[in-house]
Amino acid sequence: MLVLNRDKKRVILNFSVLLRALKTNSTTSFTFIAKNITSESAVAQVQLFAKTDILIAAHGAGITNAMYMLPGSHIVEIFPPFWYFGCYRKLVDNLRLSYSKVISHGERGPECKTDPKSMKCLIDGTRDRNFYVDVTAVKHALKEGYSLVWKNKFGVSVQ
C-alpha cells in the first residue's frame, strides 16, 4: 500500500493522524509505504507504482502513475472540499483498476469571498487548498480496496 504525501498544494493537514490510523488498523499482509514522490526520478516512480497494490492519494497528477500499476490494483482518491472533478476515475477504469473516492469537508478559501465564480476561486480557493481528511472515510475506502484487490488481483475472496 502506497500513501502519497504532498508538500505544496492539496496537503492533507492531518496526514500524520491518517498514517497512524492506517498503520494501527491495518490487519493485512500488504507492505505500507508513505512517500512524497516529487523528488523521485521517473524510473523510481515507475518501479514504485508497479509494485503497489493499493494507492491512497489526494487528487493530483501523482495519480497518473496508476498507469504503471497492475490490473486489479486499487486507488483511493481523496478530494479537497468542493472539488469533484473525477478525471482520474476515467483513467483508473481504463486501466482495469478498482477505485474509491473520499470527499473531504471544509470551507472554500478566502479567494472565493469576492468572486465565487472566478478562476481564482476555482483553482486557489477550491482545488489547490490544503485540507483535513475524514480518517474514518479513508479507512472504510481502504477496507473496500483490500477486498477488491484480493478478489480482482489474486482471485481470493475475503470478508
Which residues make up each language-model segment?
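The feature primarily captures lumenal catalytic ectodomains
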Residues: 1-159
